[in-house]
């Protein structure tokens, strides 16, 4: 396969990260194929100044193109299921922005469709591609801090303090949820990916700006994993700090591990027995750095992760077996946990 051609469905903010990923991938990584953005599908025509990209307003036109290898869904949550149904009819592989859907019922339907029709699928849970997460998983396997007593993972964003967010699609009930679905879904996937499946969760949730949002702005969840480990997750869209909080902390019987999700090259390991703290950096030759740039070449952790995630999905299409990206089954697992928020 000399080229992998894809179409982005929708062209809001997150779609631009999916688009930039193709150019970043081709310019900075020695791929066995060229990753090409061929189409951008929008409801109304837009001007595209980049050569080689065609803007269309009819999804079927794109799906009928035999040279199209996959679609990337970047539309509001409630529209995902309809787009997946259309793509399935043409057998097109599907890469979908998180969350998988706006409702558990839609997520179940989407997962069933791709499996019944043997369609390759992926979900953009991009935090999996942070090199520090790969390092954390290795340290967990080595039991560097003993058995896990507790964990805390949280993300505090401030964007919905902006009054202009009132009435935007992510503030409406039709989106399926607020801070937990939008931000917390990344965290829930990280818990599943690094620590194990969530067995039980109890939520506390609130809306502070009731005139602006119909969905949760702050949500905390107390968690019990299948293996008996306790922990918590917290997501907010209305917490302002000098430096944004995106943090994961694990407390073990012989110490702790901490990482800042926005600083993807280092984990902090504290040893209770010696009282020492090690700041362990990800080696430049580490497997997790294969499609992730060195710190001096970073475009920011968010874009870096999007690029790595789309390369991973393209690699799956190209027949590679060592991919780590989330799929619709993983997306459904997250949706099941989120759906327990009433």
Region locations from a protein language model:
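N-terminal Rossmann-like dinucleotide-binding module
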Residues: 1-51
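Rossmann-fold dehydrogenase core element
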Residues: 4, 109-126, 146-151
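C-terminal helix-rich "cap/oligomerization" subdomain common to oxidoreductases
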Residues: 23-25, 30, 70-72, 305-342
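Beta-loop-alpha module in the N-terminal Rossmann-like domain of NAD(P)-dependent dehydrogenases
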Residues: 51-113, 305
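Hydrophobic residues in well-ordered beta-strands that form the structural core
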Residues: 96, 121-123, 259
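C-terminal glycine/acidic-rich active-site capping loop/insertion
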Residues: 126, 225, 249, 254-325
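Predominantly a Rossmann-like dinucleotide-binding segment in NAD(P)-dependent oxidoreductases
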Residues: 127-213
């Amino acid at each position: 396969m000399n080229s992998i051609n894809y179409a982005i469905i929708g062209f809001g903010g997150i779609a631009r990260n999916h688009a930039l990923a193709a150019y970043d991938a081709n310019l900075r990584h020695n791929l066995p194929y060229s990753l090409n953005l061929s189409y951008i599908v929008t409801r109304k025509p837009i001007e595209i100044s980049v050569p080689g990209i065609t803007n269309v307003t009819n999804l079927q036109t794109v799906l009928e193109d035999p040279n199209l290898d996959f679609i990337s869904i970047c539309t509001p949550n409630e529209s995902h299921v309809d787009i997946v149904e259309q793509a399935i009819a043409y057998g097109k592989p599907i890469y979908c922005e998180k969350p998988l859907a706006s409702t558990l019922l839609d997520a179940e339907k989407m997962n069933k469709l791709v499996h019944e029709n043997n369609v390759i699928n992926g979900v953009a849970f991009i935090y999996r591609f942070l090199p520090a997460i790969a390092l954390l998983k290795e340290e967990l396997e080595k039991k560097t801090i003993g058995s896990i007593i507790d964990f805390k993972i949280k993300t505090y964003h401030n964007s919905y303090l902006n009054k202009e967010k009132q009435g935007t699609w992510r503030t409406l009930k039709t989106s399926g949820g607020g801070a937990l679905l939008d931000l917390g879904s990344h965290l829930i996937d990280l818990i599943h990916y690094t620590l194990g499946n969530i067995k039980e969760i109890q939520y506390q949730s609130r809306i502070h700006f009731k005139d602006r949002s119909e969905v949760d702005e702050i949500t905390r969840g107390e968690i019990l994993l299948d293996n008996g480990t306790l922990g918590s997750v917290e997501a907010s869209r209305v917490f302002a700090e000098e430096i944004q909080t995106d943090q994961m902390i694990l407390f073990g019987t012989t110490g702790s591990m901490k990482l800042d999700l926005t600083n993807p090259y280092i984990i902090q390991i504290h040893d209770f027995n010696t009282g020492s703290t090690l700041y362990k950096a990800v080696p430049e030759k580490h497997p997790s750095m294969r499609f992730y740039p060195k710190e001096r070449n970073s475009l920011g952790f968010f874009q870096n992760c999007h690029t790595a995630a789309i390369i991973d999905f393209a690699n799956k299409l190209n027949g590679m077996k060592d991919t780590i990206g989330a799929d619709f089954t993983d997306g459904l697992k997250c949706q099941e946990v989120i759906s327990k928020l009433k």
